[in-house]
Amino acid sequence: MADPAIKLFGKTIPLPELGVVDSSSSYTGFLTETQIPVRLSDSCTGDDDDEEMGDSGLGREEGDDVGDGGGESETDKKEEKDSECQEESLRNESNDVTTTTSGITEKTETTKAAKTNEESGGTACSQEGKLKKPDKILPCPRCNSMETKFCYYNNYNVNQPRHFCKKCQRYWTAGGTMRNVPVGAGRRKNKSPASHYNRHVSITSAEAMQKVARTDLQHPNGANLLTFGSDSVLCESMASGLNLVEKSLLKTQTVLQEPNEGLKITVPLNQTNEEAGTVSPLPKVPCFPGPPPTWPYAWNGVSWTILPFYPPPAYWSCPGVSPGAWNSFTWMPQPNSPSGSNPNSPTLGKHSRDENAAEPGTAFDETESLGREKSKPERCLWVPKTLRIDDPEEAAKSSIWETLGIKKDENADTFGAFRSSTKEKSSLSEGRLPGRRPELQANPAALSRSANFHESS
C-alpha cells in the first residue's frame, strides 16, 4: 500500500502514517482547535534531538560494544525531558487562562460602575425635576406688594425661580432683572379690557370737566337744542368777530318755536315780476366746530338742506300727500355769512359774494341801513311753486316762466298745443300733422305724446 500524498499546485505533499507517533512532532506541531498554541522551551526543541541523534550515531559508529545499560539510560533521559516539557506547557496554559479571566472581570466591573453612575445621575435629575414650590412669598420689587405667586423654575438656572405680581401684572425672576413689559403687551390693544376701562374713564372725566363751562340753549320742555362746549372756541370767536348787522338779522329772522308747529313763513303770492325774476342763492347750512350737538328729536331743524325741486300737483295721484302738504313745509332763514374780503372774518375757505356784506371802507351806520333795507326774508327763500294747467291762460300769466328764463310772447300761444280744434282733427284725419310750437318740435317725445293725445281726444 503506497503512502497517501496530497497533490497541491503540482507538488506532492507526503503525509505521515497514522500509527507512528513521534514525540518530537507531537510537541513541535500545531495543537487542536480546542487547545491554545504554546511556545515550547529550548530544551524541548528539535536541536537537542538532532544532537542526541548525532551522539547516538557516533556511538554506534564507534562500536557495538555498548551494552543494554547504556540504551536504558538514554530512554530514561528522554522521558524526563518529555515530562518537563509537558509541565511547562501546562503552566503557560494556566497563565493565559488567568489573564483572560482577569480581563473579563475587569470589563464587567467597569460596566457595573458605569451603570451605577448612570443610575445615580438619573436619580439626581429626577430629584432636580421634582423641585417643590418655595413656601416663602417674595414681595414684588416694583410695587412692593405681597400679591405674588410662584410660576416655575428657570430652565437654564434652577436658582432663579420666576414669579408673577398680580398687582402690576409683571413677571420677574429671583436674582434677575424685572420685566418692564406688562402682560399681554404684544396683543392688540382693543382686546385688552384694561385699555377699554382707561378709555372710558378718560371720556367721563373730560365730560365732567366740560359740564362746568357750558352755554346751552334750553327748550321749554327741558331738552337741549344747541350745545356749545368749552372745546368749541371757534364759535365764540365767530360770535365776537361778527358785526351788529348779523346780530340784528339773527334777532329779527330766527324765532324758536315748538317743534310740533315748526317755523312758518308766509310768502305773498302776488309777487311782482322783479321779485319773481331774481333767484336767490340757497341758504347755507350752519357749521359748528367741535362735538356734534345733541338733538332730542329725530328731525334736524337747523341743518335742513333745501332742495330746489317742484313738487307734483295734487291730481298726479301721489300717495299719502295732500294738496296742501307741500305748502306746509317750513324753512328757517339763515343769515348771510360775512364776506371773505373782510380781514376780521374768522371763517375760512370760499365765501359767497353777498350784497349785504360790509366793505372795509364803509361806515357802520351805512352798512346797518343797507342791511335793513336789502335783507328781506322773501328774497332769501326758495319756495316751490305749483303750475296748474287747468286754465292755460292763467298759467301763461304766471311768473314762473320768467324765473325759468323763458320769455313770454303775447302773440304766441304757449299752450296751444294742448288745445284740440276741429282744424287739427281734420288735418290728423287726412294724415297731416299740424304746425307745432318750437318747444314741442325740440322734444320729439313730447310731440308724439301730444299727437297721441289729440288722436285719443
UniProtKB/Swiss-Prot annotation:
Matching Pfam families: Zn_ribbon_Dof
Compositional bias per record (Acidic residues), positions renumbered to this chain: 45-54, 62-73
Tissue: Expressed in the vasculature of cotyledons and hypocotyls, leaves and roots.
PROSITE patterns: ZF_DOF_1, ZF_DOF_2
Keyword Transcription regulation: yes
Region of interest called Disordered, as start-end residue ranges on this chain: 1-130, 334-377, 417-457
Induction: Circadian-regulation. Highly expressed at the beginning of the light period, then decreases, reaching a minimum between 16 and 29 hours after dawn before rising again at the end of the day. Regulated at the protein level by ADO3 and GI pos-transcriptionally.
GO biological process: flower development; regulation of DNA-templated transcription
Keyword Metal-binding (UniProt): yes
Biased segments, Low complexity type: 337-346
Zn finger residue spans: Dof-type: 138-192
One GO CC term, this protein: nucleus
Segments of skewed composition (Polar residues): 22-35
Broad class of the protein's primary localization: nucleus
Mutant phenotype after disruption: Early flowering.
Function: Transcription factor that binds specifically to a 5'-AA[AG]G-3' consensus core sequence. Regulates a photoperiodic flowering response. Transcriptional repressor of 'CONSTANS' expression. The stability of CDF2 is controlled by 'GIGANTEA' and redundantly by ADO3, ADO2 and/or ADO1.
Annotated protein name in UniProt: Cyclic dof factor 2
Source species taxonomy: Eukaryota, Viridiplantae, Streptophyta, Embryophyta, Tracheophyta
